[in-house]
Amino acid sequence: MLFPLIHRWMIQVWSCSELQAAGVTAVFGIALFLPGAFNNYLVDTFSRKNVCTRSIMLLALVGILYPYVSSVEMVVLLRILQGALFGIVLMATGSTLAIDVTPSNNRNAANRVFTWSSIVGMLSGIIIGIEGGNYLSFDTLLYFSAFLCAVAIVLVSMVTVCFRAPLDLPLCSFDRFILFRTLLPGINMMTVPMVLGMLFIMISNAFFYLCIGSGFLIYLLVRQVFTRPMNGRIQIFIGQLFTGAGLMLLCNADTGEYLYGAGLLVGIGVGFSIGQFLRMMILLPLHCERGTGYHTYQLLWETGVMLGIWISQYVRQAGNNNPYQVALGICVIGFLLYQVYIHRYFTKHYQTN
């Protein structure tokens, strides 16, 4: 939700160029990694619910400070603070609390549900950020964002988590931060959110994102009907084929039926592609590495979105290429990398679990 708001605000209030505004917005993705080395210490030394709720509260408080800053540098600082806090929230929710409250035989499903919910939430936020700016002031939308954070705090507070005695852990480690075993599939996965991030910059039509959401729901319905696991190569082929088809439509025209048809195709493609990439990211971790593996996925997903935002704006400003064509190229690279190397990597390392 904050991306379209802050991007537009940077241009209108601070007279930033499109590329500068994209850079200020995308620094959020780098900041996600700042607290990572302390993640395991935080959630195994302090109450996990408290770590989560207090991080969300600080995230909300930082968010309402934007109207009071006096320089672009202070805006960058707020983006860094929000990125770091959001990184802690991601770790405390998706890779910690969601697993803690789920029986071991249902944890794969819990990871999937959390992922699907986060994608729907991201698309909903983009729509609110685009449409809300037409009816409400910047300050009002920031307070609405803080209100949503308050709702999240209430919901997390209602979760019952078993008591865990504090552990004597080192201050810094890679636990609950980055799992190198899943890093290569994760880098391959980043091509999917990078394409989405590029579209976030290029298209400000809320109905387009509703079409993406509809396509994603179509994938979920297909997945419920055909419950048997699909071959990974075939699933990635289908996903990237739909995404590529949507991008080709946008290369021809990004208005009217072309735009909405492309959104539907991209939504279906994202669903199929992420379905397989997520499967790898939750099956490759060894015993007691699930939280770290899933957090690696979360970090790389968010980083991919922010990287796509910056790449799209850079390509637009350079003026040498059509950003949709660049996005199509990224889609093809992701497909080829999976088919040539990552599928064999997954098969080999999964069999050695």
Question: Where do the PLM segments sit?
Answer:
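Helix-loop-helix hairpin linking two adjacent transmembrane segments in secondary transporters
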Residues: 104-157
